[in-house]
Amino acid sequence: MISSLKDSPLFRGMTGEDIECCLKCSHAQSVRYDKDEMIFCQGDAPEKLSVLIDGAVAVCNDSTDGRRSIVASIEKPGELFGEVFVFLGQKEYEHYAQAAVPSRILHIPREYFYSTCGKACVYHAKLIANMLAIFAQKAYYLNQKIQIISCATLRQKIAKILLEYGKAGESPAITMNREEMADFLNVARPSLSRELMRMQEEGLVKVTKRGIFVPDSLALRKIL
């Protein structure tokens, strides 16, 4: 578990020993979740910070017509989710988090971030400073998403998300499947699939079972 957390932005600049001490001091808990199991539900009280150890998590919101919208896809070990509600003092979550695959999650009590312990541990202060840096990065991410969904056409939205989150070359430009991508862009999946096929026919993208590839990023930029 410690090896997975070393790359987490929450524990940046900390040694393995520092992380172990931090987890003991905070009374953090590691919990396993099965695929599709709820990690927290909409309406639950946000009392603990959640960190992905391994697996993948979808943070979602359901519209009034029952359509699911993915707020965030958590796939990288050490990544946080639900922290905004934990530190805003909200009485309940407005979203829900669900394990996309069998996953292990670290839960750290919220109170640990509001005061330093009697030992005045350096790693405790470092953890709080890292949390502030994470909030700044999250604000930047949300700004990127707003720019993507604000694009005038579906083709522009697709081009924008591929350019923002992917790279041209041998690897897939994006790890989302079509359903997740449609949820992220807030569009119907059939509409997304049709546009992707048209873009593939024009040589703008290559759609395979492995993911969506970008042969030429410059061609995509001309769409914007």
Regions found by a protein language model. Give the residues of each.
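Cyclic nucleotide-binding regulatory module and flanking cytosolic helices
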Residues: 1-35, 79, 85-89
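Cyclic-nucleotide recognition modules
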Residues: 26, 71-129
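Glycine- and acidic-residue-biased ligand/ion/polar-headgroup-sensing regions
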Residues: 36, 47-60, 77-79
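Short phosphate-coordinating micro-motif centered on Lys-Gly-acidic
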Residues: 38-44
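Short alpha-helix-to-loop micro-motif enriched in aromatics/charged/Gly
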Residues: 65-71
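Basic, amphipathic alpha-helical hairpins
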Residues: 116-121, 142, 165-171
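Long, low-complexity, charged/polar intrinsically disordered regions in eukaryotic proteins
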Residues: 127-145
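Phosphate-/nucleic-acid-contacting segments
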Residues: 152-154, 161-224
